[in-house]
Amino acid sequence: GKAEDFTPSYDPFSYERRRSSVLTIMGHELGGDKTVRVFTPQERWNAVAHKISAMGDFKPEIITEKSGVIEIDPRDQAAVSHLNDLTEPQLISVADGLDLEVIHAFRQLAFEVDPRHPILLKDTLHPPQGDTDFLEALLPAARNIGSLLCDGIGDAILVRGENAPGQSLRLAYNILQASGNRIFKTDYVACPSCGRTLFNLQSTTQKIRAATGHLKGVRIAVMGCIVNGPGEMADADFGYVGG
């Protein structure tokens, strides 16, 4: 069968970032081991263009319409073969309007297409036309893009489920932060507390956040006991363990 004849470009059972080639688009490098970039449609870029210099860490980086992205149906073997025959890497994505779940569609794209082609992830293949509730946009975007990034798939992301330009950019960057792909603010890890916790974990965590929130890129763990705490904070830069 096909699965026996084709080796996927990623290992679905362990994390390793897909080994795509590096492209430079609008002055930003993406692909390979480069930073995962944030895309935005031209219309939304125009809406925030007057305040980009004041947007801090939530700036849009690349305009989708100017990126040269090639969008295909990953089930279309003719389109897949065309991409695999190209000698130069191209930015690729899944076409809008397909009757596929986002995660399945991008996993199939990564499976079928040569890994040299960087992938632009989307939170939805059916962008809403009217106003949307923020939570209705947040949850699918976090699930779809976050899952794929944790698979090692994706060199850039595009969030369109949230219509507000500034809010959609914040959502995109927060997904990258939560998945460990870009750290632009202090990252905190705290245990849920249990019977071994002998202090108010919630209020202590808030005090620590208030004192350290300016430490961009630092990961701080707050643990409730000395039993599991040291192990759970192994990936942190600094840790606080209560008695």
Which stretches of residues belong to each language-model region?
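Conserved beta-strand positions in the central sheet of alpha/beta enzyme cores
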Residues: 71, 157-158, 240
